[in-house]
Design a protein with these regions (language model features):
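Conserved beta-strand positions in the central sheet of alpha/beta enzyme cores
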Residues: 37, 68-70, 113, 154, ...
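Glycine-rich, proline-tolerant flexible connector loops at the mouths of alpha/beta enzymes
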Residues: 37-60, 116-122, 127, 162, ...
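Histidine-acidic metal/acid-base catalytic patches
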Residues: 1-32, 99-102, 108-110, 148, ...
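N-terminal substrate-binding region of glycoside hydrolase catalytic domains
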Residues: 25-49, 70, 74
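Active-site-proximal loop/turn and secondary-structure-junction residues that shape catalytic pockets
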Residues: 14-16, 40-42, 72-75, 116-120, ...
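Glycine-rich, aromatic-flanked loop segments that form ligand/cofactor-binding clefts
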Residues: 59-71, 103
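Active-site acidic/histidine proton-transfer and metal-coordination neighborhood
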Residues: 61, 81-193
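N-terminal small/glycine-rich loop or linker at the start of catalytic domains
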Residues: 1-12, 70-83, 116-123, 158
């Protein structure tokens, strides 16, 4: 499925939620898509062998690519947005890194998203510094593990309007983090920007300028309209010119559909904009 030469994949953690998780890749294929992506689909940092096998088999049997997989994100319903920088979750994240890399290797996934995590106490400067130091240590571990399976690690700015305690809320902050980690290990070339157009637009960033400025550092793109995080065409974001710009810049990756469908009981209705 292509528009302006772009390939679209379905985030099956937010779309097709009317179906059991393992049925979603096949539903995406039936809707005409060749790729899927997921947030970390288990509560535990290391899934059991049967769970991992079933997940990988569902994707393979559907005949779709696993485009992107998140490292463990924590309890999203409770407001968590990643464990990368969370001191109490240090052991959980580090247990998750090899597990995530192994699934990526088995499924042929080449993009692993590492959500930064919320500030534990934004008013505590010492704790904030501790979190940032931990994030760099964990990103070094994650990037090295990903490199071993020929995958990139994605850094995603998440808007601080919806998630006020999330510190990496702009493209500039994400790139600064990438550069900091690269300075620690100059051999690491697999840290990339995840350009989520919804989050960037919610932060009032100039999307065309961001796509141009960081063209060679974008590892993945995601899309939802603004406001509301619905399907393209439900808000005010001029998305088609951005797609044309990405194609003109030579972007060869996937663009993930990561929006909330108007009818959660029938995701396929949300694809009429394509």
């Amino acid at each position: 499925m292509r528009t302006h030469g772009l390939r679209f994949d379905v985030n099956c953690s937010i779309l097709f939620t009317e179906l059991p998780l393992l049925e979603r890749p096949a539903a995406a294929k039936a809707a005409g898509f060749g790729g899927v992506e997921f947030w970390w689909p288990w509560d535990d940092p290391v899934p059991g062998d049967r769970a991992a096998d079933a997940f990988i088999t569902a994707i393979a049997d559907a005949g779709v690519d696993l485009v992107s997989l998140n490292f463990i994100t924590g309890d999203i319903a409770a407001g968590e947005r990643g464990l990368l920088s969370v001191p109490k979750a240090k052991d959980a994240f580090r247990a998750n890194v090899p597990a995530c890399a192994e699934i990526a290797a088995r499924a042929g996934c080449t993009r692993l998203n590492a959500p930064y995590g919320n500030r534990v106490d934004p008013a505590d400067a010492r704790l904030t510094a501790e979190q940032d130091e931990l994030a760099i240590e964990n990103l070094l571990l994650a990037a090295r593990a990903a490199a071993a399976v020929e995958a990139d690690v994605l850094i995603e700015p998440i808007n601080s309007v919806d998630v006020p305690s999330y510190p990496i809320d702009t493209s500039a902050k994400a790139i600064a983090l990438i550069n900091t980690v690269r300075a620690e290990d100059t051999a690491l070339g697999n840290l990339k920007l995840l350009a989520d157009l919804y989050h960037l637009a919610t932060m009032s960033e100039d999307l065309s300028a961001v796509l141009a400025r960081y063209a060679d550092q974008i590892g993945h793109v995601q899309v939802a309209d603004v406001p509301g995080r619905g399907a393209p065409g439900t808000g005010t974001l001029a998305i088609e010119p951005l797609f044309r710009q990405l194609a003109a810049q030579g972007y060869a990756g996937w663009t993930g559909l990561e929006y909330v469908p108007a009818d959660p009981a029938d995701t396929t209705k949300s694809f009429t904009w394509l």
